[in-house]
């Protein structure tokens, strides 16, 4: 088989396997069979991309997991500057390095970008050292606060080809890459 799919159907706890073969001569269908039966049948060819996926295609690619509506503070720290924003009532205030009204749209936009940010690739599942990714001393670290809960993401060096930036969610060991635009706004002084 070209692709093997393991699945469980409904309340049945038994794992089944669907074996997907090559396309038919006309190219409109795919040969298929279940692992426990000799009978070969056809499935529609438009399903081919559904079956032919890599592990990365199926994983949750969010860079951070958080409830956007519960975020009540943001801390941004870089080598150049740092800032803290706190939500009071329905508005955002900069509380560090000085106390001032913050641009609601800019702060909410940042939260939105972090919430919808996606991994481009996995650089290392459990790296021995963060130095080669520039994460031992990150360029920028963002911490989102929701009551007593905190979640942080650090951004390090650019990838060799410049198409991505290494990042790490503090709650997971893996190092992944993200689009550079996700980091650019974070480097601006508050």
Model-predicted segments: where are they?
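A short-motif feature that recognizes glycine-rich, charge-decorated loops
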Residues: 1-190
């Amino acid at each position: 088989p070209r692709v093997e799919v393991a699945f469980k159907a409904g309340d049945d706890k038994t794992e089944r396997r669907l074996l997907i073969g090559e396309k038919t001569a006309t190219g409109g269908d795919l040969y298929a069979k279940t692992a426990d039966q000799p009978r070969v049948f056809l499935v529609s060819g438009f399903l081919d991309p559904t079956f032919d996926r890599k592990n990365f295609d199926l994983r949750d690619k969010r860079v951070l997991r958080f409830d956007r509506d519960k975020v009540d503070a943001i801390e941004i720290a870089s080598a150049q500057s740092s800032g803290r924003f706190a939500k009071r009532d329905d508005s955002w205030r900069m509380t560090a390095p000085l106390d001032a009204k913050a641009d609601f749209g800019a702060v909410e936009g940042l939260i939105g970008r972090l919430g919808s940010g996606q991994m481009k690739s996995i650089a290392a599942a459990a790296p021995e050292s963060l130095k080669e990714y520039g994460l031992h001393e990150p360029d920028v670290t963002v911490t989102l606060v929701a009551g007593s809960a905190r979640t942080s993401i650090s951004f390090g060096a650019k990838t060799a080809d410049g198409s991505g930036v290494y990042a790490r969610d503090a709650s997971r060991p893996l190092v992944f890459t993200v689009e550079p635009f996700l980091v650019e706004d974070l480097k601006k002084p508050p």
